[in-house]
Amino acid sequence: MKSKFIKKALCGAMALCMSTTLIACGGGNKTPTGGNSGGPSSAETGINVLLFTGTATRNGAIKWIQDAAARFTELKKDESYESGKKGVDITIQDNKLIPYDSLSSDGNDIYLDEAKADMYTYSASNELMQLDEIVSYIENDQKLTIDADAKKRMLGYESADGQRHYYGLPQYEWSNSLTYDVNYFEDAGLYFAKPDAIKSVTYEGKYGTVKFVDPADMQKSCGPDGAYGTSDDGLPSSLEEFAQLCDYIKSQGGSPFIIPGGAGGSVYSFHMVQAIWAALEGAETMKSIKAEYSETPVEVVTGFKDGEYFFGDKNIPMPITEKVVLNDTTGYKMYDMASRYYALAFMQLANDNDWFHSETKSDTSADKVQTTFIATNANERAAMYIDGTYWYHEAKLYNKGAAFTQWKRTSGGKERKLSYMCLPTTLKGSVAEGEGKKNTMLNVGSSFMFVNNRVSENAGKKKAVTDFLKFLYSKAELAAFTEYLGMNIPINYDYDEKKLGDYYYTSFKKLRSEADVITAASDNPVQYKNLSSFILGFGGALNYYTYNGQVMMEGYLQAYRNGRTAKDIYTGSTLSEAIWKTLLENAKK
């Protein structure tokens, strides 16, 4: 059942072509902080910064670095980095494309990219500047700790001294996710009731009889983690309960899911599949996807059953499975996990049952869908939004937060409560107290800053760039970043939670601290020497699949609308043993 794996070059090409649908934002914006370009003939030392056109630039988000650059420029206005020059001039641009193929001749000095930043590969070709001094400043001067997985990604090629030095710095991260409307869940009683609840609401639906909480007396179940008194209480603990919840929401006139619409928007659907996959699998064995293996066997799919279907949907056969211990010999089976198939199957079930909001069926932008989800529609309220965890600040900045203003006006001033959703950890039944699994987050959007090695040729410019990076990674500027955008950089800095000003990011901080977070980083050379083959963000290998020998670039949801099945996508996106052997050979070089 192994299909042709989507190779590195194709992954990169698709990542680039999908950038426009990623966050629907134009590239090439240029913002100088001074009065000139900082070129050789200018009166100031110039620093050119290029950001990936993404969540850190969208809807005015780029202001975080514009403001930081302005503060640094003011601080250094009287400092001379180069003979005959005084002060610095920082030019900030953003673009969909980071020019990896032409770094040696590119005019930018500092870059920020999501997911694809590959310090090992580009330090090996001597195109990146070593950043050990900045890392030392963060850890020794600022007394901060960088996340261990982030540090793995920051390491470059083995140098002449036999050491791997740092060539990148961690920036914001985001995970695959669903966001649920806490207000809606509370008002409509969409939480599962605890088994011995005195008051509850019984629902006899398509997937059996189930008890939900009484909104007036919410006695919630223990949720997917199997522990009472935690953030996931009352949320579906199994995919069976998730189906029961969606069926109940639809029976009450609501829409379980909303997602940016149309063929383009459905590329967001991988967020749902990968989030469910990680939650079902759990961190211990899910780490195999970055070649960090466990001795615990993994359940993998070997075929499909006749006459047995996924929650009765005759378009979705149940799989035949076996247990396998993954290692460098069997690592090609990492994408064969039964949990990945079940996640794909659940999205097909959602499509087959029309569990998507009507706006999903038209070519509706992310901004419009987010507005609908936040402000709500009395005629068709959406319970859950499918997107990465980056989405919230984009919505807050869009149209000056008009959706939140509308909510406040129509709700009588109630707090808008939206939250990252902990997802099911088992296939069927209900998780009993003490039997659940910790929430697993799949951080696929790790971004990094890195520096063009050309900067090293000019001692004055190198000092200016180094000082600017130290400034950005000071405690004060790290705090300013999060207090403005709400997003987190994987360093243990403090910030004023009150400045976040909303339920989503304050609750997310707690949820993240309680979760197992899996980042695309590893000590295994098969991973870090083949990074592009392990990327699971936008444009990653599993976003696409082969069907009848053709690479299909539509998103999962659009594929289901076009008649494809979970089985089609699953079998068309596994990793062949032959390709895996090539990756192993690359790791030995």
Q: Which residues does each PLM region occupy?
A:
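Short helices/loops that flank or line small-molecule/ion binding pockets
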Residues: 97-111, 184-185, 229, 243-249, ...
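Conserved C-terminal helix/tail region of periplasmic/extracytoplasmic solute-binding proteins
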Residues: 329, 478-479, 494-589
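Glycine-centered hinge/linker elements that transmit conformational signals in sensory
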Residues: 246, 284-367, 411-414, 423
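Hinge/lid segment of periplasmic solute-binding proteins
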Residues: 114-186, 191-192, 196-214, 220, ...
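Bacterial N-terminal signal peptides that target proteins for export
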Residues: 2-10
